[in-house]
């Protein structure tokens, strides 16, 4: 039996087209990874120029912005390569370590919100204690009225957190934005944390129990930034020296 030449042509065209589709998909995947990395670098560059993340020197001068500010924060992009969200204390593993200038105690955030604090480092990797842990205690505040407290997580829903320490004489509107306060120096002031969803009084105490919805979906998070406060040692040394006053 003789197979028509047209059949050979059709079969060859099919396999050729399939190979091109596979090659295109693979190329697209790697291009997407490269584009994501480039976007991270661009976001990092832009954040480093935001005036609220800089330390103002010439506060009464408006002659030249660059001479009036010193960069206070540096940002190092990193990708999550392993994570947990269902345990009582959850961690993220990042593909950046000591060779990138990472050390214990640095803050980690994403384009959507706060992620956690570096807990341990090796040469090439870092372990992040995420906001989904029992003792995270990040200082946060309510936008609009400036009320501040500590971010907590009760171990139940990875999408929701709690704020403690705000007295119930302060009105806390539902849907208020929650942001970092910046008091510890780990995070700059004003990074997104989430929104207030519920406010209830704590029985026998003069404080609120405040429920928030996190702005970041930690179950699908991949790209992060590690933040380094260039003035942190100066700030903590001053505070430690004057603790008794």
Residue ranges of each PLM-predicted region?
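Extracytoplasmic/periplasmic terminal helices and flexible tails
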Residues: 1-99, 103-245
């Amino acid at each position: 039996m003789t197979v028509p030449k047209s059949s050979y042509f059709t079969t060859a065209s099919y396999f050729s087209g399939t190979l091109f589709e596979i090659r295109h998909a693979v190329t697209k995947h790697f291009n997407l990874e490269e584009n994501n990395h480039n976007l991270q670098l661009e976001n990092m560059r832009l954040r480093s120029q935001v005036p609220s993340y800089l330390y103002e020197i010439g506060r009464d001068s408006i002659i030249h912005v660059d001479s009036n500010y010193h960069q206070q924060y540096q940002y190092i992009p990193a990708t999550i390569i392993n994570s947990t969200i269902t345990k009582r204390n959850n961690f993220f593993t990042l593909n950046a370590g000591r060779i990138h200038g990472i050390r214990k105690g640095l803050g980690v955030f994403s384009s959507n919100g706060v992620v956690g604090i570096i807990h341990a480092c090796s040469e090439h990797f870092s372990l992040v204690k995420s906001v989904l842990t029992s003792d995270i205690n990040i200082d946060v505040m309510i936008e609009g009225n400036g009320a501040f407290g500590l971010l907590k997580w009760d171990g139940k829903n990875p999408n929701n957190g709690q704020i403690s320490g705000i007295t119930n004489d302060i009105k806390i509107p539902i849907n208020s934005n929650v942001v970092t306060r910046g008091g510890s120096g780990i995070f700059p002031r004003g990074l997104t944390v989430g929104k207030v969803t519920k406010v209830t009084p704590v029985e026998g105490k003069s404080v609120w129990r405040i429920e928030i919805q996190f702005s970041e979906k930690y179950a699908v998070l991949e790209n992060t930034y590690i933040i380094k406060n260039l003035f942190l040692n100066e700030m903590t040394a001053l505070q430690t020296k004057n603790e008794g006053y």
